[in-house]
């Protein structure tokens, strides 16, 4: 299988085609470090010049900044790209007649947005919250229609003991109904979830007719539980998948002995050992581990595209090289024979 970043693939039943490689925009919001307007523009242009025509954003990214940046770039292009953004968080502030709920405890793994806009996020998965989020994203992006909406970070990973409250807002409170109405009216082409846990997508399929979902970090060379437990269900229900987090927080893109982070924390010994064995086999076949990590999810028929998040034009170009690297079938056969993939 030889991949091209610009290759167009059908996105389930949405009628959309997305490039096999998509660009996530979270870093443009100042994730981990500030990003200037000039650097953000250069990064987006490099993605476009590389043939990428699928871009993902969210109100959360830079508290609205990323949607502004992305819309400003795409509105100037002669060719229409596919855009996905998210619902579930509103960007707001206190004002006369409105008092916001207390801010949730800060996640110690969240370094914040270093040059985001001066807003505060408030979770709202209800009918009115979803509709307002859609309206706000239309204005920030500058497009009257948005191709895809993902319900952002619903689930226990984000909400812990508040999960049931937010789940009820999404289900009984009309969040899914709002998304269904937007799809029926042609305001969006499809919707699904954008999350870090496949189990909540499985649960959501019992509540709504999802078209496409974004799953981060849960289908990779180091985590394949979803391949047996979830991907067949996605195929059966006709729901396409976009996979993000293919490097599992960096360990699969780092050189041997380099960064040892897995799922935003220090990698446990068994993950380090598995990664070292992957390095051994990659060296044998002269394949960069990062290239294998990027291409692996697309070997499954349920997956339409993968998303990358980068901080510079150089990183985009390097990712495209990895993505388009020729990998022999024997390499994958060896991984399978050693139980590293199924």
UniProtKB/Swiss-Prot annotation:
Temperature curve summary: Optimum temperature is 30 degrees Celsius.
Catalytic activity entry: pyridoxal + NAD(+) = 4-pyridoxolactone + NADH + H(+)
Enzyme class, broadest EC rank: oxidoreductase
UniProt entry keywords in alphabetical sequence: NAD, Oxidoreductase
Gene Ontology molecular function, alphabetical: pyridoxal 4-dehydrogenase activity
Biological process annotations from GO: vitamin B6 catabolic process
Residues the record lists as binding NADP(+): 245-255
A Pfam family the protein falls into: Aldo_ket_red
UniProt family annotation: Belongs to the aldo/keto reductase family.
Subunit text: Homodimer.
Name assigned to this protein: Pyridoxal 4-dehydrogenase
Species whose genome carries this gene: Microbacterium luteolum
